[in-house]
């Protein structure tokens, strides 16, 4: 029997925090028509689907920290988060489909990339939902500690509000210091 896993990451363009990736092997009974790219869903719908997916699949989350992003760059950190998610799966898939155009370095796994896979492949869509909800929960927690930056609404992306707060309050330990405009301020 062929076991297919889908993988996607979130948080690459954010100015703060870790990048998250999820790997998902869907149960055959799951309604694949419900699964869409996380970016096209409301927060409430993502959270509802995340519970449904977790209940009806084998899944795992990987992440790469802010320090790892600064050390190895965002592309390699994203691939590292994907690799960690794949390796955490309880079952080894016979094929792993990865959103994008790059593959993590993972021996003894059959990997294929799918450009815009989060819009085409249900297991990748499911991975995008789990990764997004997981990262959003982490960022929401951070926003309570650092409430001047609007992270609860901007997820750490470079919005006007966030950039204004950086100028006013400075950067935090969660800001990615190698990312412009943060690096321009240092």
Curated annotation (Swiss-Prot):
It catalyses: Endonucleolytic cleavage to 5'-phosphomonoester. GO terms for molecular function: manganese ion binding; RNA binding; RNA-DNA hybrid ribonuclease activity. It holds the Pfam family RNase_HII. The keyword Nuclease applies. Keywords: Cytoplasm, Endonuclease, Hydrolase, Manganese, Metal-binding, Nuclease. Residues 2-186 form the RNase H type-2 domain. One of its GO terms (cellular component) is cytoplasm. Its cofactor is Mn(2+); Mg(2+). Its EC number is 3.1.26.4. The keyword Transport does not apply. A divalent metal cation binds at residues 8-9, 99. Manganese or magnesium. Binds 1 divalent metal ion per monomer in the absence of substrate. May bind a second metal ion after substrate binding. InterPro entries: RNase_HII, RNase_HII/HIII, RNase_HII/HIII_dom, RNaseH-like_sf, RNaseH_sf. PANTHER family: RIBONUCLEASE H2 SUBUNIT A, RIBONUCLEASE HII. This is Ribonuclease HII. The gene is rnhB.
